[in-house]
Amino acid sequence: MFSFRKFLAFMLIVIALMASFSSAQPIDEERPIFMERREASAFGDIIGELKGKGLGGRMRFGKRSSSPSDISMAELRAIYGGGPVEYVQL
């Protein structure tokens, strides 16, 4: 029969083996998932607005007004160090 210490040692070995064969992959391996971007065209914005309206959305032409509390990306980079942008796999 196993003593408690032998059982504990066995469980630690099993856990260590499971951790060494983990299925977690680093970010850069396997196939990264990229977001698809549409090509810019002369009528791309208008077509997008019309599609949105046809699907029950509201039409928004022009730039949205921003509130004074909005912070631009340049200001965020200045505040948080301005390092390179890191992409995260989804």
UniProtKB/Swiss-Prot annotation:
- Keywords recorded for this protein, A-Z: Amidation, Cleavage on pair of basic residues, Neuropeptide, Secreted, Signal
Look up the signal peptide feature and give its range.
Answer: 1-24
Please give a single GO biological process term from the UniProt record: neuropeptide signaling pathway
Task: Point out residues bearing the modification Phenylalanine amide.
Answer: F61
Coarse class of the primary localization is secreted
Q: Which residues form the propeptide?
A: 25-36, 65-90
Q: For this UniProt entry, what's an example GO CC term? A: extracellular region
Where is the protein situated, by its record's location annotation? Secreted
What this protein is reported to do is described as: FMRFamides and FMRFamide-like peptides are neuropeptides.
Give the UniProt family note: Belongs to the FARP (FMRFamide related peptide) family.
**What is this protein identified as?**
FMRFamide-like neuropeptides 27
